[in-house]
Curated annotation (Swiss-Prot):
Molecular function terms from GO: O-methyltransferase activity
Protein family membership: Belongs to the class I-like SAM-binding methyltransferase superfamily. Cation-independent O-methyltransferase family.
Role noted for this protein: O-methyltransferase; part of the gene cluster that mediates the biosynthesis of aurasperone B, a dimeric gamma-naphthopyrone. The first step in the biosynthesis of aurasperone B is the production of gamma-naphthopyrone precursor YWA1 by the non-reducing polyketide synthase albA, via condensation of one acetyl-CoA starter unit with 6 malonyl-CoA units.
Binding site for S-adenosyl-L-methionine: W200
SUPFAM superfamilies xrefs: S-adenosyl-L-methionine-dependent methyltransferases
Catalytic residues in the record: H299
GO terms of biological process kind: methylation; secondary metabolite biosynthetic process
This protein's name: O-methyltransferase aunE
Domain of life from the UniProt record: Eukaryota
Keywords of the record: Methyltransferase, S-adenosyl-L-methionine, Transferase
UniProt KW Membrane keyword: no
Pfam families tied to this protein: Methyltransf_2 (PF00891)
Pathway it works in: Secondary metabolite biosynthesis
Length: 386
């Protein structure tokens, strides 16, 4: 039965509308980040119009593409306006990233200040509203064209399908990271990974709070036997946090950063080692380490690729070795990142049961696990001894 014509929109309808119309507004986030609109608004320090923000931007950065001008015909007059900044600031206000005041005036709020004070968060926002939004736009098209072939496999996701349909045949065969490298986006992504959207404390603090006895593990091991291998460790922030917490135990030779990311650069405080675990013939080069770490690595991988990587680590683990995995707890709070991993990487966040299945396929068993309602879970695996 149709609702009466004069009936107000029900709360459920408002919820649906406000949620599904987010995507177009999110498309403006990269503009705000690219032109540092959050930083400009915060530095102004008081309510400001879009023109005020543009003027401040010009003073700080000089002439940029922000100043492309639109001429609007209004009756018999032409008005010169900058619609890019005005619409972008308005939509950032709609998303809650700044405050909307009457008469097209904008003001920094707590979210604005967080974005300015946490540069990695702005780079993360750019990533999910660029690569992530592109992939989501082509999800249904990819499914329909393949008769709903699912789950996706690595390098064959809606992200690659988007590039295929746009005529970028070379990029359509590449991994997301390779595409970001070729398009100049990888350095931004690496910056995101150093701090993400903010973290509580250091890695030792976080695992300690969840009940994992990292202190006891390191202190009960002879110094000459301590080696920590961070697989896919980016710019080494996890190892550097461990070094700062245990300076008497962890020196450069104890800390091994394994990466194949082309834009990482030099991390002088740790031992850098290239390892592309994607290559079938490339085995884990460090045997018998005390601790192998994977932080936000496996959620980028499909189950098949995860098992391959876990097997490579399992084969070189000693009976005393630990594999420590840190990912988001899979629940409603992480459902959006779960979707992002599926669409861009064919990966996923995982539950305890899913981690146990992966471990079993790789000859490993879970010996510690903790799943907080928000933030990172911690899963320790050890080799199954026959």
């Amino acid at each position: 039965m149709a609702a009466p014509q004069n009936a107000p929109i029900p709360e459920a309808g408002k919820k649906v509308m406000s949620t599904v119309t987010l995507a177009p507004a999110l498309g403006f986030v990269p503009i705000a980040v690219h032109f540092d609109l959050f930083g400009c608004l915060q530095e102004i320090g008081k309510p400001a119009t879009a023109q005020d923000v543009c003027n401040f931007h010009h003073t700080k950065y000089g002439d940029t593409d922000l100043f492309s001008i639109t001429f609007l015909h209004n009756k018999s007059m032409f008005a010169k306006v900058n619609r890019t900044s005005d619409d972008t600031l308005f939509l950032m206000g709609g998303l809650g990233f700044l405050d909307l005041l009457p008469d097209d005036v904008y003001q920094a709020n707590a979210v604005t200040r967080f974005l300015v004070d946490t540069p990695s968060a702005q780079h993360g926002a750019m990533h999910f509203t660029s690569e992530g939004l592109l992939a989501s736009a082509f999800l249904m098209r990819r499914l329909m064209d393949t008769k709903f072939e699912y789950p996706f496999q690595e390098c064959d996701t809606p992200f690659q399908y988007a590039h295929k349909l746009m005529g970028n045949d070379h990029l359509a065969r590449e991994h997301v990271y390779s595409v970001m490298h070729e398009t100049g986006r990888l350095d931004s992504f690496n910056t995101f990974m150093t701090g993400k959207f903010g973290r509580w404390g250091t890695m030792p603090d976080r695992v300690r709070k969840l009940g994992y006895d990292l202190d006891g593990l390191l202190q009960s091991t002879a110094p000459e036997r301590i080696r920590v291998v961070d697989i896919g460790g980016g710019r080494g922030e996890l190892l550097l946090e461990m070094q700062a917490t245990y300076p008497h135990l962890l020196k450069k030779e104890n800390l091994i950063l394994q990466e194949y990311n082309a834009d990482i650069g030099v991390v002088p405080e740790v031992t850098e080692m290239g390892w592309n675990y994607k290559e079938d013939a490339s085995e884990q080069p460090v045997k018998g380490a005390l601790l192998y770490s994977m932080a936000h690595v496996l959620h980028n991988l499909s189950d098949i690729e995860s098992i391959k990587l876990l097997n490579k680590v399992s084969r070189v683990m000693a009976p005393s070795s630990r594999l420590l995995i840190q990912e988001f707890t899979k629940n409603a709070a992480s459902s959006t990142t779960h979707a992002a991993m599926i669409l861009m990487h064919a990966g996923r966040e995982r539950t305890s049961a899913e981690w146990r299945d992966l471990a079993a396929f790789a000859g490993l068993e879970i010996t510690f696990e903790a799943y907080p309602p928000n933030g990172e879970c911690v899963v320790e695996m050890r080799k199954v001894l026959n």
